[in-house]
Amino acid sequence: MQTATVLSIFISSLLLGITIYSIYISFGPISRELRDPFEEHEE
């Protein structure tokens, strides 16, 4: 494989992994432990 192909596959899989991880953090079981600063300061 050419270097550009390997590099583009690596970068796209890295971005996909970061996206999947951030969705898991936002909506997964860990999301119950996240604090909401807007709810803390509502009046």
Swiss-Prot record:
Biological process according to GO: photosynthesis
Recorded superkingdom: Eukaryota
Alphabetized UniProt keyword annotations: Chloroplast, Membrane, Plastid, Thylakoid, Transmembrane, Transmembrane helix
Topological relation to the membrane, as annotated: Single-pass membrane protein
Cell compartment(s), UniProt: Plastid, Chloroplast thylakoid membrane
Family named by the database record: Belongs to the PsbN family.
PANTHER family linked: PROTEIN PSBN (PTHR35326:SF3)
Full protein name: Protein PsbN
Annotated source species: Gracilaria tenuistipitata var. liui
